Amino acid sequence: MKANMRCWLLVAFFTALPMVARAEWQAVEKVETYAIAGKTGIELYESIGERGPKIRGLVRAIAHTDFKLTWSRKYENQDGACVLVSARPNLTITYTLPKPAEKLPAASRRNWETFFIGMRDHEKVHGEMIKKLVKDIEAATVGMSVPGDPKCLKIRAELKKRLSELFVAHQQRNRDFDRVEMGDGGNIHQLILKLVNGG
């Protein structure tokens, strides 16, 4: 009886391996900072405006979340069809946040810490959206099959189409989130007011 039980447990374990392997990946998350000058909230905010990261080389932001995503994909020819049998992501998310270059007075430091934590948490939401994008890509592409594609050439065009659709949806989620956060009365708007007004 015990031997049979061990056998069934082993079968269940190895049957579950592909599912486990798919869930194993983890994003590497890094925080980079840029130096800002000033002792008061308004001085710090003005320095952010001068030194903040440029988005697409055009507009400066308070903070920014970027990512690098590569894939290890395995294709198989199955009866003349090309099948994407596995895809393992390698994801690095980088958060860029401001950091005062000098020690701040006590009152400014408290206000700054509130501002910084709020901005960090905002960017972390963008990070979670990136992770969702990667999971959506996995769900939409692993197992996809293109008939009449023994050399796995046509499947790449179909893959590109699916990725494009998912990325457009991802960008829209980010824009919608920022619109609420940065609008009048939004979280970022409130954080800026409290930093600048010292309250």
Label the predicted regions.
Residues 1-9:
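Bacterial N-terminal signal peptides that target proteins for export
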Residues 110:
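Phosphate/adenylate-binding glycine loop and adjacent helical scaffold
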Residues 8-18:
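Bacterial N-terminal signal peptides
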Residues 131-141:
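Membrane-interfacial alpha-helical segments at the cytosolic side of multi-pass membrane proteins
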Residues 118, 122-130:
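Active-site recognition of the HExxH zinc-binding catalytic motif
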Residues 24-103, 147-199:
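Metalloprotease/metallohydrolase-associated module, dominated by Zn2+-dependent proteases
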